[in-house]
Structure formats: C-alpha cells, structure tokens
Amino acid sequence: MIRISQDLGAGSSSCRVDPGGIAEAGSRLRASLEDKPDLVVVNKFGGLEKSGGGLADELLWAMAEGLPVLTAVSGRLVDEWLEFSGGHCDLLRPDEAALWQWWGSQRLYQDLLLGVADGPIARITRSAHWLLIEGPDACGLARIPRGADQAGRSLEDFAAQGLRQLASLVNSIDLFEAALGLAALNAHYNRPGLEVGGGNGLDAFAEEEGRVVAIGSFPDIARRLPNALVVDAQPDAHEYPAAAADWLLPGCAAAVITASTLANRSLPRLLDLARGSRVALAGPGTPLTPRLFSYGVEILAGFIVDDPAGMAQCIAEGATPRGFRQFGRQVTLRRPG
C-alpha cells in the first residue's frame, strides 16, 4: 500500500499530499497498465488531477488504451471531469446496480472464465446436436448451434488442451468451438455436489401475471407456460421470429432464455433488452454459478450429470434432453433475496 498523503499532526482533520507518494503511486500504476488489467480503479478525481497533476496522466493513459476506468468525482468537480475526459465517460449513481450496468453484460464470458480451474479432460462426446465434456470433477453439456461446422473437427485434439484452455473457446467466433467452450465451463461449474434445488426452469414463472417471453422453443413449453410469447430462430405459426425480441423483452414481466444463447453470443444483448425484468436462464447447457446473478439473471435452471458413462452413451446415440434424465437431474439455482 502506498500512502499519498501526510497527516498534519494531532488535532488536525486535514492532510497534505505527499509528492513522493504520488510519484511512487504513478509509477506503480503505469507498470500495472502495461499488463492490460480488466479494470482500473483510481480513488478519486481531485484538485490535483483537475490541474494536470496527481494521477491525471495515468487516468488519461488508461482511457486512451480503452481500459475501463472507475473513479469518484465530487459534485463540485463534475464540469472539470467532463472537460478532462472530453465527455467520453458515463456518470454513474454510487450504487451496485449502476456499476454492473456500466460494466456491461458482454463481460460475463470473461467473468465465467475467471472461475475455471485447469485439469485434464477425460472424454468429449458429441452427437449432431449436443456436446458432452467430462472434466476432472464434473460433466458439462452444450447444444451445438445451428450452422456450426463440425466437419473434420478432431475431438482428441480439443481434449488435449485441458479444461481451462478449452473453456476459453467460449469467446470464439466459430460456433462449434464456442459450444465446446460452454460445455467446458459447465464441466467446471455443474458439479454433482452443488447445493441446488430441483425443478424445471419453465416452471419458474408459471404464476407470473404479466407478459412472459420465452427465447427458444423449449420442449413442453405449451403446457408449462401456456401464455408465454415464444421467440425462436425458426418459429412455427404460433411463435415469433428472433427479431421480435427487440420489442417483446423490454418491459416484460419475466423472460425465460435458452442457455444456447451463450454459445451463439446473443445472451448479453438479450439481457440488456430484458433489464429490470425477472430472468431465468434455462436448459442443460446452463452454467450453475452465482457469477451470472450480477448480470441480471435471477434463476439458473440447468442439469447435473450423475452418470458420466451413461450420459456419454446417451449423447453418442443421439438422444434428446428428455433422454438425459436417467443419467442426471434438472436443478435450479436462485439468486438470494
């Protein structure tokens, strides 16, 4: 810890800035910026920075590099801050909800990756529609997105990468690789010993009186959520096309979103559209981790594999999620409060 102020003695409520401390803090901060941190936090934008001193150069450097910068600005210095930053900033309320909204739902992928421990991959199994990855502690499932190119993809080569490296493929623009990355994430998070409840994700909002939107044509949805407005990439006569999410999600009472949106990278945008509404992320490919609660998800309805060998055979034979149930269980994880 570097002190940048000096006490003026007993009985004084003031302090003065220590030039040596400022210089050392600036040097340390510049060195840290070279490593491209996820977030730069500077205690405050004060009188020194307003005049071009203090940590002004480091703040400008971080912003010029495109790094997210968070600092406190007093009301009397707001105009000076806007001039200093050139207006390229967001003024936030000092509360957690505003901070998470500023942070952005697109960062949830990196957040999920930060929690993954490395380890060997025992097996990868695929069918035309599903992937199963068996890691050191659990199995993870993911649906392969429509349009994913599986031709000539060696599962052995992917398995040799290890769990953490394979999970990083969730950031890939290649749909098959992104699905592998999601399955690897789930092979870390969806562990048999996890403290979770039971239940089907479609039941989460069965009693909701307002508009309920389902992103994805879930099996059995007509019975479990008969009044839901269903949005699907390939809608039938009673469903809406994908573009309808733009006007159906804002202001809805609740939304059930398929976990497949993680692999096709549409989830962040859908969460932004549904901001302020109750949201459940549902499907066998749902990562069961509280990390997703901060991004607006209230309920995680996923799947835990209890019989890896049986599930691998089930996937290899091309079974649907209905057939998964004899080798694992549907579970829910709810945001506290």
Residue ranges of model-derived segments:
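Flexible phosphate-sensing "switch/lid" loops adjacent to ATP/NTP-binding sites
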Residues: 1-36, 48-55, 77-99
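Structural motif
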Residues: 39-41, 70, 213, 254-258, ...
